[in-house]
């Protein structure tokens, strides 16, 4: 190993390359997990305000992938791909997220943990690990935290109305 940080080497996980979002959701872990893994449910909430979503493929299993488009108000299409690494129903998803191209240098690791709370709610912790500090800082600079929080707000609304 070269010692250079990568998203594939867990020994290089570093907080300076990480974005963490947390949201307590008024839903069971099963319902939250289904919102992430059912293609119809996923597109009802995924993406920041003003974006729509279309799933082209969703195969949620280790080694599977989801390919989907996020479309902005002005019609700009952003292709996306999740490559699933770990799937533990109602508990955890680990995936690599990037554009729907092979060898995307901006691809980052996402870990979604679902923790049931004593009151029946679910705490969702979403951790993004970016390949470099610079890439993380660039994402923060264009609003990744705010847009991510908008997305989790849409998830909360979806779960209340589902």
Tell where the protein language model's regions lie, with residue ranges:
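Hydrophobic/aromatic beta-strand elements that line small-molecule binding cavities or substrate pockets
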Residues: 23, 55-58, 80-86, 108-116
């Amino acid at each position: 190993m070269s010692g250079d940080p990568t998203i594939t080497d867990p020994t290089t996980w570093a907080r300076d390359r990480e974005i963490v979002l947390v949201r307590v959701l008024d839903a069971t872990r099963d319902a939250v997990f289904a919102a992430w893994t059912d293609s119809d449910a996923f597109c009802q909430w995924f993406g920041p305000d003003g974006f729509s979503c279309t799933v082209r493929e969703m195969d949620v299993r280790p080694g599977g992938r989801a390919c989907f488009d996020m479309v902005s108000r002005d019609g700009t299409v952003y292709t996306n791909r999740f490559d699933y690494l770990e799937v533990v129903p109602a508990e955890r998803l680990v995936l690599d997220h990037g554009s729907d191209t092979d060898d995307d240098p901006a691809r980052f690791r996402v870990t979604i943990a679902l923790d049931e709370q004593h009151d029946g709610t679910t705490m969702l912790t979403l951790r993004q690990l970016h390949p470099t500090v610079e890439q993380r800082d660039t994402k923060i600079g264009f609003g990744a935290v705010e847009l991510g929080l908008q997305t989790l707000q849409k998830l909360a609304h979806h779960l209340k109305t589902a």
